[in-house]
C-alpha cells in the first residue's frame, strides 16, 4: 500500500504459492490441511491483498504457474487456483514458457520446440476456464513468455528471435493483447520486437514452421 503513495498504480506479486522444492511432510504448516486446502489459503491471501490495494486504487496482479491453468494436480500442489485467483486479481500473469511443459502436453512432442502452438494452447485454455466467470469478475491476462533457451530440456533447440516472436503472435491469436518477456540474465533480443503491428513477419513465420517440423522429425527418428 505504501507503494501507492510513491506513485505506483499497480503492484505485481510473484511466488504466491506453496513450495515445489520440499515435500509437505518436511514442512510444518500452521494450518489444518484437513479443513483448509492450499488453494483456499492462497485464494484468501489474493482476496485480502486485492481488497487492501483496491481501497487505495492500486491494481493488483499476480504471477502464476502456466500449468495450473488446466492441470489440477499442479494447481493443488502449489495452491494456485487459476479461476478463483482471477476473481480477485485485476491481472493474472501465467508463466506459459514452452520449456516448462512436459512431453506430449497439448499433444506436442517437445513443447519447447513448438513455441507458437504451446503458448496458443495454454492461452486458449486460459480463455476457456476464465469464461466461466462473469464479465465483471474476469481478470486481465498478461502472460509471461520465454526469451531464453532451455538446454536442460532433452531435444530442445536454441531459441531465436523468431521463437520469441512466435509466442507473442500466439498471445494475439488467443485473443489477448498484453505480454511480458522473461530471461534470467536480463538479456532480451530487440529483433524479436521489431513488428509494431502485432503481425508476425512472414520470414519469421517460415523460420518457426521449418524449425518445428525439423524438430518433430528429429524426435520421431530418434524413437
Language-model region placement:
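A charged, solvent-exposed segment within the mature domains of Sec-exported extracytoplasmic proteins
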Residues: 1, 17-19, 23-26
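An active-site-proximal structural segment forming one wall of the substrate-binding cleft
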Residues: 1-16, 77, 81-88
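Substrate-binding cleft of secreted/luminal carbohydrate-active enzymes
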Residues: 8, 89-100, 115-217, 222
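A structural signal for short, well-ordered beta-strand segments and their strand-loop junctions
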Residues: 10-14, 60-63, 181
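Conserved beta-strand edge residues that scaffold enzyme active sites
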Residues: 17-18, 67, 185-186
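Glycoside hydrolase catalytic-domain groove-lining segments
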Residues: 22-25, 29-65, 69-72, 76-152, ...
Amino acid at each position: 500500500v505504501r507503494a501507492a503513495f510513491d506513485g505506483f498504480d499497480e503492484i505485481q506479486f510473484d511466488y504466491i504459492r506453496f513450495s515445489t522444492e520440499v515435500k509437505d511432510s518436511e514442512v510444518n504448516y500452521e494450518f489444518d490441511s484437513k479443513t483448509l486446502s492450499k488453494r483456499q489459503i492462497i485464494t484468501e491471501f489474493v482476496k485480502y491483498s486485492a481488497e487492501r490495494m483496491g481501497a487505495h486504487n492500486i491494481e493488483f496482479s499476480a504471477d502464476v504457474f502456466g500449468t495450473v491453468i488446466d492441470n489440477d494436480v499442479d494447481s493443488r500442489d502449489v495452491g494456485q487456483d487459476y479461476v478463483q485467483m482471477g476473481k480477485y486479481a485485476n491481472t493474472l500473469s501465467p508463466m506459459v514458457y514452452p520449456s516448462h511443459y512436459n512431453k506430449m502436453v497439448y499433444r506436442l512432442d517437445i513443447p519447447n520446440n513448438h513455441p507458437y502452438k504451446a503458448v496458443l494452447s495454454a492461452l486458449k485454455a486460459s480463455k476457456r476456464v476464465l469464461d466461466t466467470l462473469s464479465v465483471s469478475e474476469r481478470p486481465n491476462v498478461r502472460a509471461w513468455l520465454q526469451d531464453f533457451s532451455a538446454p536442460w530440456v532433452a531435444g530442445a533447440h536454441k531459441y531465436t528471435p523468431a521463437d520469441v516472436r512466435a509466442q507473442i503472435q500466439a498471445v494475439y491469436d488467443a485473443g489477448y493483447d498484453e505480454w511480458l518477456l522473461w530471461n534470467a540474465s536480463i538479456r532480451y533480443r530487440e529483433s524479436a520486437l521489431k513488428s509494431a503491428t502485432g503481425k508476425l513477419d512472414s520470414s519469421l513465420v517460415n523460420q518457426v514452421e521449418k524449425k518445428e517440423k525439423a524438430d518433430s522429425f528429429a524426435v520421431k527418428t530418434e524413437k
